[in-house]
Amino acid sequence: MERFVVTAPPARNRSKTALYVTPLDRVTEFGGELHEDGGKLFCTSCNVVLNHVRKSAISDHLKSKTHTKRKAEFEEQNVRKKQRPLTASLQCNSTAQTEKVSVIQDFVKMCLEANIPLEKADHPAVRAFLSRHVKNGGSIPKSDQLRRAYLPDGYENENQLLNSQDC
């Protein structure tokens, strides 16, 4: 009798999971949103472990409100942390440097024309006045550096000016 009993065919136990998908496959599929570390799939902006087997779990996470909020915060932090290019930094410094040099050269020229010894620039009252009332006045060096570095430039400039006036 057992031979004639009809049994139902075994139910197919097919779930909707991809059995041979690795976290790296999902990273290449979803681009910069995800990264793989130690065989686990992470959301880059949320820093949450995701199930790499179910694609729907990943897409649901990427559409969620918490992910979009954290992604906006993550991008804002990256913008703030982003380094300035070297050329932009050097341009800022070069502008400030040229302004500093022009202030120092004007100060040396003023001292020479008014017959003020450069040693007077070392006096505390002169230093206080320059730093308080002159833009970049605190950047004027001591008298020995003024004499060594900036006096020859002023001398050459004045000689060229006198030579051009004589002709």
Curated annotation (Swiss-Prot):
Main localization of the protein described in the UniProt heading: nucleus
A GO biological-process term: negative regulation of transcription by RNA polymerase II
InterPro entries documented for this protein: Cggbp1
Modified residue annotations for Phosphoserine: S56, S164
Alphabetic keyword roster: DNA-binding, Nucleus, Phosphoprotein, Transcription, Transcription regulation
Gene Ontology cellular-component terms listed: cytosol; nucleoplasm; nucleus
GO MF annotation, one: double-stranded DNA binding
Tissue: Ubiquitous. Highly expressed in placenta, thymus, lymph nodes, cerebellum and cerebral cortex. Low expression in other regions of the brain.
Record localization: Nucleus
Motif segment (Nuclear localization signal): 80-84
Nucleus keyword on record: yes
Lipid metabolism found in the keyword field: no
Note: Binding is severely inhibited by complete or partial cytosine-specific DNA methylation of the binding motif.
PANTHER family noted in UniProt: U1-TYPE DOMAIN-CONTAINING PROTEIN
Function statement: Binds to nonmethylated 5'-d(CGG)(n)-3' trinucleotide repeats in the FMR1 promoter. May play a role in regulating FMR1 promoter.
Identification of the protein by name: CGG triplet repeat-binding protein 1
Annotated organism of origin: Homo sapiens (Human)
Gene name of this polypeptide: CGGBP1
